[in-house]
A protein has these predicted regions:
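Structured beta-strand-rich core segments of catalytic domains in phosphoester-bond hydrolases
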Residues: 81-184
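N-terminal, active-site-proximal structural segment of metallo-dependent hydrolase catalytic domains
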Residues: 2-11, 17, 21-96, 106-119, ...
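A generic structural micro-feature
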Residues: 32, 125-127, 157-161, 282-284, ...
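Active-site beta-strand/loop signature of hydrolases that rely on acidic residues for catalysis
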Residues: 37-42, 64-87, 135, 167, ...
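Short catalytic/ligand-binding loop motif for oxyanion handling, primarily in non-cytosolic enzymes
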Residues: 45-48, 84-87, 109-113, 131, ...
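Extracytoplasmic/secreted proteins, especially bacterial periplasmic and envelope-associated proteins
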Residues: 59-70, 85, 89, 130, ...
Length: 341
């Protein structure tokens, strides 16, 4: 989300008409040397935000759980897990299908089940966690957290331990690393050039951090809410610059006109509601969420960048042109299946 950290940190001290889009089918478990990745900003603010802004986390969380379960990806990256009750519920609900998961990035600054924590992690009572977590059907052999050193001063992200999780997944003896992350958000009163510069610096942090841990040993996939505007940022070169900064290939549903944008307020009733809460346009449309892979000398990569789809799960009886009143988040999930060497 563009401004979730604004509200979360503050309380710590649905234009275009959709036509011809149908719900994406649930992914089947990948077979052979493949790994499917599902990434979603689930928009679950802190308990105080939830109460003061009437965000109904208790009602939305079971829908989040249901959507994750039905898409059945091998690995799930979640962002904006700021609500501790929702996080505990999701862990419990997914336990049978996803018995392995990392902790939430930035919840603690040492120990906590991580093999290592790096970056600028704060233990201050005025700083919230980073909200990012990885779930897996398959064993996680190692897990690392990095809290970004680069953050835009004067924005609410500055008061969050946002960063990235890195998990080594062992699927039937084939090891693949997965990065889950949530980059700097835009904020009213701060230049987008400034926040985009921070995002590029954060992607550079990810590249250096991952290279230092993984080297060329195995493929590295990445997913999450990068807050990189595929459409609105085209004139700035945001997408190309993001790929260059992270040293990788970022897949997006934005290249397929039949797909929803990952933040699609004209379609999503919840996106419209959150526009009113967070002061972004209630007709906002852009793709901010990506899945892809990272390059490094000698490192194996997927055979090709797969098609990335926006998972769309509207209410029963939905037809094109109606608002989606089922979505529990202002973002739609993205998903892809990677064929690995």
């Amino acid at each position: 989300m563009r401004k979730r950290a604004l509200l979360a940190a503050t309380v710590a001290v649905a234009s275009a008409v959709l036509t011809g889009v149908t719900a994406a089918p649930a992914a089947h478990a990948a077979t052979g040397n493949s790994l499917s990745v599902f990434a979603w900003n689930v928009d679950l603010g802190t308990s105080i935000v939830d109460s003061t802004e009437n965000e109904n986390a208790a009602g939305r969380t079971p829908v989040v759980e249901q959507i994750i379960q039905q898409h059945n990806a091998d690995v799930v990256v979640l962002d904006e897990l700021f609500n501790h009750s929702s996080t505990s519920s999701i862990e419990s609900a997914l336990a049978a299908q996803y018995p392995y998961h990392t902790p939430v990035v930035g919840q603690v600054c040492s120990g906590g089940g991580w093999n290592g924590i790096s970056g600028d992690c704060s233990n201050s009572w005025f700083v919230i966690n980073g909200g990012t977590m990885i779930f897996s059907k398959y064993p996680i052999k190692a897990q690392y957290a990095h809290v970004f050193s680069n953050s835009t001063s004067g924005t609410w992200d500055y008061n969050a331990n946002k960063g990235a999780a890195l998990a080594e997944i062992d699927k039937n003896g084939v090891n693949t690393w997965v990065v889950g992350t949530h980059l700097q958000a835009d904020q009213s009163g701060t230049s987008t050039d400034t926040t985009q510069s921070t995002r590029l610096a954060q992607l550079g942090e990810i590249q250096g951090w991952v290279n230092g841990i993984v080297g060329s040993s195995a493929p590295v996939l990445i997913g999450g809410d990068l807050n990189v505007e595929y459409f609105h940022g085209a004139s700035r070169g945001d997408y190309a610059n993001a790929q260059n900064a992270v040293g990788g290939v970022l897949g997006t549903p934005a290249t397929d006109p039949s797909q929803l944008t990952t933040m699609d307020c004209p379609v999503s009733a919840w996106c419209q509601y959150m526009g009113g809460v967070e002061s972004f346009p209630t007709n906002y449309q852009d793709s901010l969420d990506y899945v892809g892979y990272l390059n490094a000398p000698g490192r194996p990569t997927p055979l090709a960048l797969p098609s990335v789809v926006t998972d769309f799960d509207p209410q029963a009886g939905w037809t094109a042109g109606q608002l989606d009143t089922q979505s529990p988040s202002d973002h739609y999930p993205v998903q892809a299946t990677f064929q690995l060497p």
